[in-house]
Curated annotation (Swiss-Prot):
Matching PROSITE patterns: GATB (PS01234)
EC number: 6.3.5.-
Cystine bridges: none
Reactions performed catalytically: L-glutamyl-tRNA(Gln) + L-glutamine + ATP + H2O = L-glutaminyl-tRNA(Gln) + L-glutamate + ADP + phosphate + H(+); L-aspartyl-tRNA(Asn) + L-glutamine + ATP + H2O = L-asparaginyl-tRNA(Asn) + L-glutamate + ADP + phosphate + 2 H(+)
Annotated SUPFAM superfamilies: GatB/YqeY motif, Glutamine synthetase/guanido kinase
PANTHER family registered for this protein in UniProt: GLUTAMYL-TRNA GLN AMIDOTRANSFERASE SUBUNIT B MITOCHONDRIAL AND PROKARYOTIC PET112-RELATED (PTHR11659), GLUTAMYL-TRNA(GLN) AMIDOTRANSFERASE SUBUNIT B, MITOCHONDRIAL (PTHR11659:SF0)
Gene3D superfamilies in UniProt: 1.10.10.410, GatB domain, N-terminal subdomain
Subunit structure: Heterotrimer of A, B and C subunits.
Top class in the EC scheme: ligase
Keyword GTP-binding included in the entry's annotation: no
Organism: Marinobacter nauticus (strain ATCC 700491 / DSM 11845 / VT8) (Marinobacter aquaeolei)
Keyword Ribonucleoprotein (UniProt): no
Protein name listed in UniProt: Aspartyl/glutamyl-tRNA(Asn/Gln) amidotransferase subunit B
GO molecular function: asparaginyl-tRNA synthase (glutamine-hydrolyzing) activity; ATP binding; glutaminyl-tRNA synthase (glutamine-hydrolyzing) activity
Length: 483
């Protein structure tokens, strides 16, 4: 039987506020366990929550950026359940009247098409603490530093039909929240966590199948793997005549396997009721307009500008505009390097490869946009060859020297572009390769002739000690060999 895949996402976005959603405790990452949890976070008797205005502002900014309705009246409820890292015995969240209503995000797919994914709603809530299982001799430690950290939980409609679409949406959302500055987007620190709801239905059927939820995926790669794994698992069960159990599952990316955590609860299992400690929050026009005035350039607008302003193709503009820090680095490079296409090639090539290899962010790169721009300028004005540029880049990256011209001078990398000198080298090399010259001139196939030119370039680069301008060498060769 053929199946349709149905996917919806729940994405927890940790807001980049300085303090927690209902207390004054710091949200800084990496502190010693239980050093950033005050009496409110610990649910001590007599404590009362005080809402964090910045969390509401960030939520409204998110709603505006995702074409969503803003809930003018926002209400908090208590979601009741027991877990060791939830000291109150309930989570303060939103259900009936969330701060962000229906919206949508358009995603770009590999085949060049665009798809609209609807957002059902996004609500504010507090994060739980963290259970620590290592170094406790068979016991579990509880760190409540994270308890009370503000989250937006984004809930999509089940509009996605493949892992590709789900990952594309997750990447687009990551791009939006980091561009807004409301989340640092560091998934290794739990700043964004993805829950994937998956079900299968017979191809063409309108009746949805039973869904499962795979929780706490913290990378795009794991999300893709988890979806593929769960789809295959459900197909195997259904095709063997079995029944899918509605449950929450945990995926292990290292082993490519999942296990059941618990039977999936319904909303009434959590006994939601309005939080008596928090009044409804009224969002007025002035607050919304203030949030709107704080919106930066968003990824789609930045992409369009990069295409128009710098003449980039759609692919390059998409890659360079998706990440706000990478976009800023690109623009700094172009400011100092002038040639936008050349700058784009180096950033997407050598620069990004080194970042990935060393697991660094753009902010941690040991080279600045100004330095890369200076190098791009020297490539564009034919001072540097591609091979020489790689040596300059290496010197910049390792901190050997931070001045491009000084590196070129010290390493003798200045490219020879004097046509008289280059012609003399070409004449000398051709004189020493009469058989190859004759073979080239007797060849009628243009493609083969073009390929045969490469046989002359090696000796020419050797004669010029690697400093001859390859483009000029090629032009001189074609002219002297007769086309």
């Amino acid at each position: 039987m053929q199946w349709d895949i149905v996917i919806g996402l729940e994405i927890h976005v940790q807001l980049a506020t300085q303090t927690k959603i209902f207390s004054g405790s710091s949200t800084a990452y990496g502190a010693e366990p239980n050093t950033q949890a005050n009496a409110v976070d610990l649910a001590m008797p007599g404590t009362l929550p005080v809402p964090n205005e910045q969390a509401f502002r960030y939520a409204v900014m998110f709603g505006l950026a995702t074409n969503a309705e803003i809930g003018r009246r926002s209400v908090f409820e208590r979601k009741n359940y027991f877990y060791p890292d939830l000291p109150k015995g309930y989570q303060t969240t939103q259900l009936a009247q969330p701060i962000v209503g229906p919206g949508y995000v358009d995603i770009d797919l590999a085949d060049g098409s665009t798809k609209r994914v609807r957002i059902h709603h996004a609500h504010l809530e507090e994060d739980a603490g963290k259970s620590l299982h290592e170094d406790y001799h068979g016991m579990t430690g509880i760190d409540l530093n994270r308890a009370g950290t503000p989250l937006i939980e984004v809930v999509t409609e089940p509009d996605m039909t493949s892992a590709e679409e789900a990952v594309a949406f997750a990447k687009k959302l990551h791009s939006i929240v980091t561009s807004l500055g409301i989340c640092d987007g560091d998934m290794s620190q739990g700043s964004m966590r993805f829950d994937v709801n998956i079900s299968l239905k017979p191809k063409g059927s309108d009746t949805l199948g039973t869904r499962t939820e795979t929780k706490n995926l913290n990378s795009f790669r794991f999300m893709e793997q988890a979806i593929a794994h769960e789809v295959e698992r459900q197909m195997d069960i259904l095709e063997d005549g079995g029944v899918i159990v509605q449950e929450t599952r945990l995926y292990n990316g290292d082993r490519d396997e999942s296990r059941s955590m618990r039977t999936k609860e319904e909303a009434n299992d959590y006994r939601y009721f309005p939080c008596p400690d928090l009044l409804p929050v009224e969002i007025d026009d002035a607050f919304i307009e203030d949030a709107r005035s704080r919106l930066p350039e968003l990824p789609d607008a930045r992409r369009a500008r990069f295409k128009e302003q710098y003449g980039l193709n759609d692919y390059d503009a998409g890659i360079l505009s998706a990440d706000a820090k990478l976009a800023a680095f690109f623009e700094e490079t172009v400011e100092h390097g002038k040639d936008a296409k050349l700058a784009a090639n180096w950033i997407q090539g050598e620069f990004s490869a080194r970042l990935n290899a060393e697991e660094k962010s753009v902010a941690e790169a040991p080279i600045t946009g100004a330095q890369l721009g200076a190098m791009v300028t020297r490539i564009a004005d034919n001072t540097l060859s591609s091979a020489g540029a790689k040596k300059v880049f290496e010197a910049l990256w390792t901190g050997e020297n931070n001045d491009v011209d000084a590196i070129i001078e010290a390493k003798g990398l200045k490219q020879v572009s004097d046509t008289g000198a280059l012609e003399s080298m070409v004449d000398e090399v051709l004189a020493g390769m009469p058989d190859q010259v004759a073979q080239y001139q007797n060849e009628e196939d243009p493609k083969k002739r073009k390929k045969m030119l490469g046989g002359f370039m090696g000796p020419l680069m050797k004669a010029s000690k690697g400093q001859g301008n390859p483009k000029l060498f090629n032009e001189i060769l074609v002219r002297k060999l007769g086309g």
